[in-house]
């Protein structure tokens, strides 16, 4: 029986630190940095979604801590960044302002979107980024939500976004 699974990893950064600590206890230590060998288990877990048979699906959502001031956190994030299919970057200022979801739209996105989206969809996404790019992060989400409320689906949004962009240029 085929099953689709979603795995939530609250902190891939913390899990990687645990693997690093275990490696240190085995005598493999890199002072102030993460031993790349110790990250192989985290990469293997994070990359498991690509290794399924029989058309099953495993989707992994993992949180990574960035911009904490810790060289170890930054090192882990850089090392694991290439494993992800997409990045959703949260914005602290937007969260503090009560904007939800507090997503930084300009830093978030799907890697290699051209493989799964049509040219029209990619052009629409680019246009949305151009329109919202001049706004502060805390203003982007309310503006996008306002646009979404005026449309019934993604296709409608992409059609109307061209008209809105033309109006904004006038």
Where are these regions (language model features)?
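P-loop NTPase catalytic core
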Residues: 1-170
């Amino acid at each position: 029986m085929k099953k689709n699974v979603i795995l939530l990893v609250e902190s891939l950064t913390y899990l990687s630190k645990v693997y690093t600590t275990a490696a240190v206890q085995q005598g493999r230590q890199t002072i102030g940095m993460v031993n790349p060998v110790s990250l192989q288990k985290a990469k293997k877990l994070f990359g498991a979604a690509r290794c399924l048979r029989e058309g099953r699906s495993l989707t992994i959502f993992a949180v990574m801590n960035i911009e904490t001031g810790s060289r170890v956190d930054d090192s882990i994030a850089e090392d694991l960044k290439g494993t992800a299919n997409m990045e959703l970057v949260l914005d602290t200022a937007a969260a503090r302002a009560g904007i939800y979801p507090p997503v930084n739209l300009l830093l978030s996105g799907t890697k290699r979107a051209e493989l799964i989206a049509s040219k029209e969809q990619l052009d629409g996404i680019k246009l949305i980024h151009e329109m919202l790019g001049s706004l502060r992060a805390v203003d982007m989400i309310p503006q996008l939500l306002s646009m979404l409320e005026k449309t019934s689906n993604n296709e409608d949004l992409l059609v109307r976004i061209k008209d809105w962009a033309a109006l904004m240029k006038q």
